[in-house]
């Protein structure tokens, strides 16, 4: 039987939601991750240090794993203050602030409409060593949804990188060759997370033979040429790319609707799905760096010291999984996953 032992991985982009669903989402993500960076786009958004620490307490209250720890982030708004950034940084639990362009994704209505308005905050973040996480899409209606990431790189991200060269920036859940190339060519303070579903799927999986709502996420799946570029970047061994699932659960009812929510649930099998990608590319030797080393190295945090073991043993993903009082349909529902964490 084929086995693979790696340093315990981390998830640098995770949505746990809030309320009664936390019991399920924390269980799934805590099964083998050492740490997870928790996204702040709740309703209302996590915009203050107190809100972030309170959210962390709610997560920890249902966290039964002694190897899993949540890392928190703030939701950046045009009203965020420099004092709030300093206060958050001083806690030791909040390591980043997330820039959501207003209207770009789930619960992003409180996001930033004009990046220039948060430039004073970015200056403070650069001084304090607080990382900037970015959902990299423009939201103007004249830009096609498949082009919003590329346009963001040219019009928003490039000026930020130029104006704040010492600010550490993570371009989250990249979906295009353009984004992968931007990160590769940028300086050492720019990195990116890549999801399992953007490595495994392209827009044909979502649209051919009928609409598959559980593949609908933001940024949206792109054509296969972009998928191949993401696979190359993720498996390359470059320290600029690391694991961030963007596992984003919604109830089955909210996904299978006339106006369905954006987000795919992969926390139930994230490392197993990434392992498939690396195996298919003949790059299993690079999985540990992508999953376990590059993230903490970029965040200036220690690597995990324990390990997990994956076994090449197929198992069938449940059709649905518990999600508070509802159910969530996970990626690969009813289908085989080729690796299993023992």
From Swiss-Prot:
Cofactor info, note text: Binds 2 Zn(2+) ions per subunit.
SUPFAM superfamilies: Metallo-dependent hydrolases
Gene Ontology molecular function: dihydroorotase activity; zinc ion binding
Residues at which Zn(2+) 2 binds: 98, 135, 173
Root EC class: hydrolase
CDD domains the UniProt entry points to: DHOase
Pathway listed: Pyrimidine metabolism; UMP biosynthesis via de novo pathway; (S)-dihydroorotate from bicarbonate: step 3/3
Active-site annotation: 246
UniProt record similarity statement: Belongs to the metallo-dependent hydrolases superfamily. DHOase family. Class II DHOase subfamily.
Official protein name in the record: Dihydroorotase
